[in-house]
Amino acid sequence: MNKAVVVFALVVVAGLSTIASQARAAEKSKKGGTAILMPAGDIKWTDVPQFPGVKMAVLQGDPDKGAHHTLIKLPAGFTAPLHHHTSDHYATVLSGTMVFTVDGKEQRLPPGSYFSFTGKKTHITKCDAGTDCVISNDVRGKWDVVPEEGKAAKM
């Protein structure tokens, strides 16, 4: 198993400004902290125009400004070619099977699997055919997807 367990580096660049505007209701707890309780039916999914079929739900934070937590839904068979992200991110596969290619090696991650990428680690991201994929993504800075122009990944 590859030590650099791959993070789902999903693709959502410019469409984030509209997604980030979704406000989430926070409820103060008796001890002064914050609780966010969001039933699945209340989650607002937004299309990501740059990547047809991809949807994103901002749960906390603002992807255009800094650290944030999102859900990302990829259609079955989706592929994001070789790319990297500037910020570190940590993710869990909630449904579907994600397929990452890192350093020329392909790794399949079924539901319940974890992956992370530190800034600028190149990879290819796929959602296996047959079932849409959903990941929970914790990003430690602004979100971007930087294509690796002219570089082909080893398959």
What annotation goes with each model-predicted range?
Residues 1-7:
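Positively charged n-region of N-terminal signal peptides that target proteins for export
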Residues 7-17:
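Bacterial N-terminal signal peptides
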Residues 23-66, 150-155:
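A short, N-terminal "cap"/entry segment at the start of jelly-roll beta-barrel domains
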Residues 33-36, 45, 124-155:
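Double-stranded beta-helix
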Residues 62, 103-120:
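Short acidic-glycine-tyrosine-enriched beta hairpin
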Residues 68-85, 118-120:
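Conserved short histidine dyad/triad with adjacent acidic residue
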Residues 75-78, 85-103:
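Glycine- and acidic-residue-biased ligand/ion/polar-headgroup-sensing regions
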Residues 80-82, 100-101, 117, 122-129:
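Short beta-strand His + acidic residue motifs that chelate non-heme Fe in jelly-roll/DSBH
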